[in-house]
Amino acid sequence: MTTLGTPLSPSATRVLLLGSGELGKEVAIELQRFGVEVIAADRYANAPAMQVAHRSHVLDMLDPAALRVLIASERPHVIVPEIEAIHTETLVALEREQGQKVIPAARAARLTMDREGIRRLAAETLGLPTSPYRFVDTAADYREAIAAVGLPCVVKPVMSSSGKGQSTLRSEADIDAAWEYAQTGGRAGAGRCIVEGFIDFDYEITLLTVRHAGGTSYCDPIGHWQQDGDYRESWQPQPMSAAALRRSQEIAKAITDDLGGWGLFGVELFVKGDEVWFSEVSPRPHDTGLVTLVSQELSEFALHARAILGLPVGAEDGGVIGQSGPSASCALLAHGNGVPVFDNVADALRDPNTALRLFGKPRVDGHRRVGVTLARADSIDAAREKARVAAAALGIQLTA
């Protein structure tokens, strides 16, 4: 797609975002830089990407009839899934029946919507190294799986995001509570889970991998720290051995080649020395990749937009996207109930090498990521500290 129209005109190039959170918002902004007409959809009103889109729709994207009505009415040239909670079989059918373009492809969206499809592809079809695992449907199966993989282990709903429903079990005392949480924390309600054996890794990385018209290119590895299964900090580049980096790129290429299509993938990997294990892959920008808003000339969102549109991404096949030096991000979390209001914004931005993104989340109920601080410095440690200091300076209030 190298010819682009004018938005809100008969020539418009229309892109439909299925999912309108903070990552979708940045994708929408990058698409609009190329004059793309952006339509944003999600299950709730005033989602972040809706605030910058040309039009928006609220619907249950797990409802196949509602999804078909939306797509028929908007007639998008491209559909870009931005979350997992979508009736992906509808996308597969529309791709087959009508040639509807889905990013990166309808099969990739279907396989990656839950952990079972992608884990079986990686481990059983492609033979990639992974942690030991079992899929379970009942409490009895769950206990058998724990006995098989051993403690410590991790349990996750097959369909969840941002750490919801995920627990690390370190002793038998954790077993019952972890199962209960997994049954209430998944996007599709109670049901199937994965029990994963624990890998004694040195660190985790996200290897952002771009499939584009010119081939496959990679961003420098992103290190990250999680708490309660959710991203708290990320930094780029993560130091690692040449052998581990090479193996990481090989694994990322294998899984993304099989999924196919154009777009950016977030490939999550465990690393210990020169050894690398596949963990998960998302066929879209990744939350840990928010650091690329300051660490790269082309952020993960700009890369995704360019790849979607068939445009050059600034690197050749097998090449690495340009990086600006040690950079870090720190997530901003709000706790409680209400509409977020931010104080001391000037203090958070006092250092000239810091930046701030407030996502525009319409409401917080419980706890929610509402923004991110970003920083560059002479070292990763210094960049992380700057991002933390900026985050600590910001006040977050919740109003009724």
Swiss-Prot record:
Residues bound to N(1)-(5-phospho-beta-D-ribosyl)glycinamide: E22, L23, E82, D287, K361, R368, R369
Keyword match Thylakoid: no
Pfam families registered for this protein in UniProt: ATP-grasp (PF02222), PurT_C (PF21244), RS_preATP-grasp-like (PF22660)
List of residues binding Mg(2+): E268, E280
EC number in record: 6.3.1.21
Protein origin, superkingdom: Bacteria
Alphabetized GO MF terms: ATP binding; magnesium ion binding; phosphoribosylglycinamide formyltransferase 2 activity; phosphoribosylglycinamide formyltransferase activity
GO cellular component term, pick one: cytosol
SUPFAM superfamilies according to UniProt: Glutathione synthetase ATP-binding domain-like, PreATP-grasp domain, Rudiment single hybrid motif
Catalytic reaction list: N(1)-(5-phospho-beta-D-ribosyl)glycinamide + formate + ATP = N(2)-formyl-N(1)-(5-phospho-beta-D-ribosyl)glycinamide + ADP + phosphate + H(+)
Keyword DNA-binding (UniProt): no
UniProt entry keywords in alphabetical sequence: ATP-binding, Ligase, Magnesium, Metal-binding, Nucleotide-binding, Purine biosynthesis
Binding-site list for ATP: R115, K156, S161, S162, G163, K164, G165, Q166, E196, G197, F198, I199, E204
Function: Involved in the de novo purine biosynthesis. Catalyzes the transfer of formate to 5-phospho-ribosyl-glycinamide (GAR), producing 5-phospho-ribosyl-N-formylglycinamide (FGAR). Formate is provided by PurU via hydrolysis of 10-formyl-tetrahydrofolate.
HAMAP family for the chain: PurT
PANTHER family named among the record's database cross-references: FORMATE-DEPENDENT PHOSPHORIBOSYLGLYCINAMIDE FORMYLTRANSFERASE (PTHR43055:SF1)
Subunit description: Homodimer.
Family to which the UniProt record says this protein belongs: Belongs to the PurK/PurT family.
Protein name, UniProt field: Formate-dependent phosphoribosylglycinamide formyltransferase
Protein species of origin: Xanthomonas oryzae pv. oryzae (strain KACC10331 / KXO85)
